[in-house]
A protein has these predicted regions:
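Short amphipathic alpha-helical segments and helix-helix/interface helices
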Residues: 1, 31-34, 146, 175, ...
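Conserved residues at the C-terminal ends of beta-strands
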Residues: 15, 102, 191, 256-259
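Short, acidic/polar
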Residues: 1-5, 78-88, 168-181, 239-246
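Aromatic-rich peripheral "rim/lid" segments of glycoside hydrolase catalytic domains that contact
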Residues: 116-127, 205, 212-218, 231-290
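Glycoside hydrolase catalytic-domain groove-lining segments
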Residues: 151-158, 165-236, 245-248, 253
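Short glycine-rich, flexible loops that bind phosphorylated cofactors or substrates
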Residues: 21, 197, 265
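Substrate-binding cleft and catalytic face of glycoside hydrolase catalytic domains
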Residues: 2-158, 163-165, 232
Length: 290
């Protein structure tokens, strides 16, 4: 964390899993990391996945302990989990500036085959199973998480986060659903993973999307995730420099987070970090210190 701060990063984004098998990213782990960041003077974002494992466009599975709950019980579980983690931070004197309620939730969240308790935004076919669409539940789950955040930290900004930040149609679809359901939130956050051969086009589309979200929904915006191939550091630096500059030009844009900067080389099969195989940061991260 100290190295990343010295490289120009002033904020950290920490994911929360409900009951991970190895303990990483559970409540105590998140509090420990947030405390370290707090001691370094960094701003903190908490990212609730509402899952025991990674939640992303291909995986929005319920925590094992929540399977079989009724709709009301599920909402209670969302609220209790959210408040439990945030109160643990509060007890340590840590105030997160932003809180995500769900991670890359374009296909919804807390999938279930039973439409009455599913939060999918469309019928999601996965491995011979179809997780049922229920837009109302999807919006209600976000509302539940948002209200829980505000109960503990009234001034924290609630984030709704989708993938494919360059896809304006997707964002209009999801945020029209939330608007129709009067869902409370503060910030629209995006992921963007450009290729080395199309980054100019993707950055331009993402910036246009941010501008449209500000205009259409009167919300602040943010890049919650951006990543580029670690072994193309100069191209990555050019992309990040342009994205950061254009984001700064949007008054309502709150910032840009890299994910996952300290992933080195192709560690664990992931190639979009910003450290090389020797464990040193590449020049890509110079973009954060300009």
């Amino acid at each position: 964390m100290t190295l990343l701060r010295d490289l120009g990063m002033n904020s950290i984004r920490l994911r929360v899993w409900v009951n991970p098998s190895d303990g990483w990213c559970n409540k105590s782990d998140v509090v420990a990391k947030a405390w370290r960041a707090h001691q370094l003077g960094m701003r903190v974002m908490i990212d609730f996945h509402y899952s025991d494992v990674w939640a992303d466009p291909g995986s929005q599975y319920k925590p094992a302990a929540w399977i079989g709950l009724s709709l009301d019980e599920l909402k209670t579980a969302i609220a209790d989990h959210t408040k439990d983690v945030l109160n643990a931070l509060k007890e340590k004197g840590i105030t997160p500036e932003w809180v995500q309620v769900g991670n890359e939730i374009t296909p919804g969240m807390l999938w279930d085959e039973d439409a009455t308790v599913s939060g999918a935004t469309y019928d999601v076919p996965k491995e011979g199973v179809t997780y049922a669409k229920n837009e109302k539940n999807f919006a209600d789950f976000i509302t539940t998480g948002s209200n829980a955040v505000k109960e503990v930290f009234p001034n924290a900004k609630v984030i709704v986060h989708l993938h494919d930040g360059n896809n304006n149609g997707t964002y209009r679809w999801i945020f029209d659903i939330l608007k129709a359901n009067n869902t409370p939130y503060d910030v629209i956050a995006m992921s963007l993973y450009p290729g080395t051969d199309n980054w100019q086009e993707m950055v331009a589309a993402c910036v246009a999307n941010m501008e449209d979200m500000v205009s259409r929904y009167n919300k602040e915006v943010m890049i919650a995730e951006v990543g580029m191939p670690w072994d193309e550091p100069e191209i990555s630096k050019s992309c990040l420099t342009e994205l950061i500059a254009k984001s700064k030009a949007i008054e309502q844009c709150l910032g840009v987070f890299y994910w996952e900067p300290q992933s080195y080389g192709s560690w664990n099969g992931y190639t979009l970090g910003a450290f090389d195989e020797s464990g040193k940061p590449t020049v890509a991260l110079d973009a954060f210190n300009q």
